[in-house]
A protein has these predicted regions:
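Gly/Thr-rich phosphate-binding beta-strand-loop-beta motif of the actin/hexokinase/Hsp70
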Residues: 2-28, 110, 118-141, 157
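Active-site rim beta-loop-alpha module in soluble metabolic enzymes
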Residues: 147-204
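Short, charged, surface-exposed secondary-structure boundary motifs
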Residues: 40-44, 90-95, 153-158
Length: 204
């Protein structure tokens, strides 16, 4: 298959490196790795690059220094890489220079995929940080918000206090929000953090 029909997308986040292989414009396969272990990502992605040819590599990274360590062993990879940034894209107007590439990618995707039949689109991205990004159907950036993600909120409560336990998002699977009030510490933290996030999203 021609190189132009293949593209490898790499999203380097604060916690995870998420990758997707697009064939003919459709997502074909996905992989993810720990950002703390870029060597593993480099080894696997190099094998994918060799297997699937020299197609475009699109990269969004919010962690400076990780991308060079991933592609340092890729032969001729640099000339195929498109690094997403506010200045490298042409779809969205009004983006500010320091805007994270993850939010730039969200804005571009929202505009391309979700504004054909709508006046505007909002992307809410729950990661290490929770971000909100909005664009209209003319490709104008409408603004957004950034706050602490749920995992980091749990960690902040634990490490900033003497007695509150550290919880994880995995423990939220069976959380009931039938009432905002809780009668034990763990449930009080869970409901407080989750309802706080829900409230933020609804307010925005």
């Amino acid at each position: 298959m021609a190189e132009a029909e293949r593209a490898l997308a790499i999203d380097i986040g604060n916690s995870r490196i998420c990758c997707g292989l697009f064939v003919g414009g459709q997502l074909n396969e996905t992989w993810n790795y720990s950002t703390a272990d870029p060597a593993t990502a480099s080894s696997h992605l190099n094998s994918l690059h060799n297997k699937y040819g020299r197609g475009l590599i699109a990269v969004s990274s919010v962690v400076p220094g990780v991308l060079p360590s991933i592609i340092e062993k890729w032969p001729n990879a640099r000339d195929k890489i498109f690094e997403v940034s506010a200045s490298s894209q042409t779809l969205i107007t009004g983006l500010y220079e320091t805007m994270g590439s993850d939010r730039v990618a969200n804005a571009a995707a929202a505009f391309k995929l979700h504004t054909n039949d709508a006046e505007a689109a909002i992307v809410i991205d729950f990661g290490t940080a929770t971000t909100l990004t909005a664009v209209n159907n003319k490709g104008n950036f409408l603004g957004g918000m950034i706050t602490l993600g749920l995992t980091k909120t749990f960690q902040a409560l634990h490490y900033s206090t003497a007695q509150l336990p550290e919880l994880s998002v995995q423990e939220l699977e069976n959380l009931s929000l039938s009432s905002p009030l809780a009668f034990d510490t763990q449930t009080a933290i869970e409901r407080g953090c989750v309802i706080g996030h829900i409230g933020m999203v609804r307010y925005w």
